[in-house]
A protein has these predicted regions:
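Domain-level recognition of nuclease-like catalytic cores that cleave nucleotide substrates
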Residues: 160-212
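Short, small-residue-biased leader/transition segments that mark boundaries at the very start
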Residues: 3-8
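Acidic-basic catalytic patches of nuclease active cores, encompassing PD-(D/E)XK
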Residues: 57-105
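Hydrophobic alpha-helical interaction segments
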Residues: 12-51
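A short acidic, amphipathic alpha-helical/loop segment
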Residues: 141-146, 166-170
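Conserved catalytic cores of phosphodiester-cleaving nucleases, focusing on short active-site segments
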Residues: 88, 109-136, 143-145, 155
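Hydrophobic beta-strand segments of well-ordered beta-sheets in folded domains
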Residues: 128, 151-157, 174-177
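Short, composition-biased local secondary-structure segments
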Residues: 44-60, 108-113, 133-144
Length: 212
């Protein structure tokens, strides 16, 4: 346990603005790995007494297992948003989270902010919408109508690979995937050059905002 704590401490000391902005893909994956280690340690501490006590029947076991799984899913989704938010702040990007758009939709990230989105004199070409989902599957469609002013939606995901048919459908619907750079190799070769690594996405946003 002490060795694990020292390892986590050493990683934390190496974090600075330069390393985050120059290698956001690498930093994000390192944060996710470290957070998962901490969360597993927390889970063991929290659940061990219950597991040692046991369960009276199958239904109790299933119910308790579902609680654990739901907590894991909730943590993973929220932590991804928080990690991305931290990276965007270090990279000096202007953005706002949970902006209320049409029909009370709330995209995860709007660049540069909600006021610009709702100002119809602000050029739509300078607006960017980014959704963040740990996995895509069929959930990617949720972002399609979250920001009507922005025709091309960006979607960040940690999913390692999506079927060729689903990728084709995504790009027909003007969804541009953003994934950690090391994960691009898991996608069909014919789509790899269309997928943005995180460092390219932050550079893309920065270039637009430098023109404002």
């Amino acid at each position: 346990r002490r060795q694990r704590q020292m390892c986590i401490r050493d990683r934390a000391h190496k974090i600075n603005k330069n390393t985050i902005c120059s290698e956001p893909d690498k930093q994000l994956l390192a944060w996710i790995d470290t957070e998962y280690e901490l969360f597993r340690a927390f889970e063991a501490k929290l659940y061990d007494p219950v597991l040692k006590t046991g369960f009276s029947d199958i239904e109790s076991l299933i119910s308790y297992s579902n609680q654990i799984l739901n907590r894991r899913k909730s943590r993973a989704g929220k932590s991804l948003e928080h990690h991305l938010e931290t990276i965007f702040k270090f990279c000096d990007l202007k953005f706002e989270t949970q902006v209320i758009t049409e029909e009370h939709k709330k995209p995860d990230f709007i660049f540069p902010d909600g006021a610009s989105y709702h100002n119809f004199e602000f050029p739509a070409d300078d607006l960017i919408c980014l959704g963040a989902k740990t996995t895509c599957k069929d959930r990617w469609r949720q972002i399609l109508n979250e920001a009507d002013r922005i025709p091309v939606k960006h979607l960040f995901t940690l999913q390692q690979g999506v079927s060729k048919n689903q990728l084709a459908e995504m790009y027909r619907e003007k969804v541009c995937l953003v994934v950690p750079k090391p994960y691009i190799r898991y996608f069909d070769e014919s789509f790899q050059d269309k997928i943005m690594p995180l460092n390219v996405f932050t550079g893309f946003v920065k270039a637009k905002q430098n023109r404002l």
